[in-house]
Amino acid sequence: MRTRWGWALLVLWAVSLLTALLVYGQRQLSLFDPDGKLLHLSTAPSFDTELVQLLHHQNIKAGSVVHVGTTSRCYCESLTSPHQNQLLASLGEGYQSVRLNIDEVPALQAMLHAVPALIVLDNQNQLRYLGPYATGYGCFTGKNLVEQVVSYATQSPYNGAVINADAQGCFC
């Protein structure tokens, strides 16, 4: 009888733990562009050019990998460091890492609902990618988008930017 109670308590503990993890995980999972604002803006023919000009006014040059975050550096931002390092290593020389606080750029804040976000400008100052670093729970158990971003950044000929607004992951 005693072992049955022991097993019942063990099963109850395991179910409680898994439920707590699931609830916590669901709170960490959010949409990158929940109301479709970025998707709508990106359909304008001048979107790429306007975003590059906005970045130019922030002294961001060609060949930049721009990390868009907040001044408070939320938990989800801390998970992007490995992605940033992998991306810069894969792109090689000619690319520099730049940090941009969304709080300081109201026009960018009006476009992006969630951070961390990634913007890649190639060496010809063309927008190549705008979107998240990764998707999934905590942005480390899901899909790492670094290889795709590298292929977008180095694709020839240039066919326009990839705007990844349809993503779900750890965003603030």
Model-identified regions with their sequence ranges:
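Short extracytoplasmic/periplasmic juxtamembrane "stem" segments immediately C-terminal to an N-terminal membrane anchor
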Residues: 34-52
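Short active-site neighborhood of thiol/selenol oxidoreductases, capturing the structured segment around
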Residues: 53-75, 149
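Membrane-embedded segments
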Residues: 81-82, 107, 115
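A short, hydrophobic beta-strand/beta-hairpin element that forms part of a small beta-sheet core
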Residues: 114-134
